[in-house]
Regions:
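Hydrophobic alpha-helical transmembrane segments
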Residues: 10-11, 55-56, 76-77, 115-116
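Membrane-helix interfacial "entry" motifs
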Residues: 1, 5, 50, 63, ...
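Membrane-interface helix termini and inter-helical loops of multi-pass transporters
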Residues: 131-140
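Short helix-perturbing small/polar motifs within transmembrane alpha-helices
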Residues: 78-117, 121-130
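Central hydrophobic cores of alpha-helical transmembrane segments
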Residues: 55-63
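Hydrophobic transmembrane alpha-helices
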Residues: 1-48, 52
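Single conserved hydrophobic/aromatic residue that forms the stacking wall/gate
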Residues: 141-151
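Interfacial aromatic-anchored transmembrane helix boundaries in multi-pass membrane proteins
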Residues: 18-31, 63-89
Length: 151
C-alpha cells in the first residue's frame, strides 16, 4: 500500500490541506458560502486505485482540515462517507454490474456521467457536513426547546 502512488497522493493531500486552510478558508462567496476545494481529491481519485488507500488518504485529509479548523471531525466524516460511497455511485451511474465494473475505467465516462458523479458526491458531502455542523440535541426532544433555540 505504501508505494510510489500512495506517497504521491499523500503529497496531494498535504497540498490540499494547505490550500484549503491558507487560501479557501478566507474566500467567501456572496458573504456566506465558503468553497470546500478538498472534495476534488475523492472525485478525481483513479477508479482502479487502491480503495483502502483512498479511505486512508481521505481520513488524513479530513482530519488535517478538522485539526486546523477545530471542527470536531465533521470534515473527516463527510469526506470518508463520500470516499466510501464513490464506487457505488459510479457503478450506479455507469449501469455496470460487479464483474464488468472491475474492468471499467473512469476515462470511459461521458461528460454527463462525470458531471453527475461530481454533483452527487458534492451534494452528499455537503448534506453530511451541514447536518453535523448544525446538529443540536435540544432540537431532538422537545418542540419548546427548538422554538426557544430558533428565536
Amino acid at each position: 500500500m505504501f508505494n510510489r502512488d500512495f506517497i504521491f497522493n499523500l503529497f496531494k493531500v498535504i497540498l490540499l490541506i494547505l490550500l484549503q486552510v491558507v487560501i479557501f478558508d478566507h474566500i467567501e462567496v456572496m458573504g456566506k458560502a465558503q468553497p470546500f476545494f478538498y472534495v476534488v481529491f475523492v472525485v478525481f481519485y483513479p477508479q482502479l486505485g487502491n480503495k483502502y488507500a483512498l479511505l486512508l488518504l481521505s481520513f488524513i485529509l479530513g482530519f488535517g482540515i478538522d485539526f486546523v479548523q477545530q471542527t470536531g471531525g465533521i470534515h473527516t466524516f463527510s469526506l470518508l462517507s463520500i470516499a466510501f460511497l464513490r464506487n457505488k455511485i459510479l457503478r450506479l451511474i455507469t449501469g455496470q454490474d460487479a464483474d464488468e465494473y472491475d474492468r471499467y475505467n473512469t476515462y470511459d465516462l461521458s461528460a454527463l456521467q462525470w458531471f453527475t458523479l461530481t454533483i452527487l458526491l458534492i451534494i452528499i458531502h455537503h448534506i453530511f457536513l451541514f447536518v453535523l455542523e448544525n446538529f443540536k440535541f435540544c432540537l431532538l426532544y422537545t418542540s419548546d426547546a427548538a422554538d426557544d433555540y430558533l428565536r
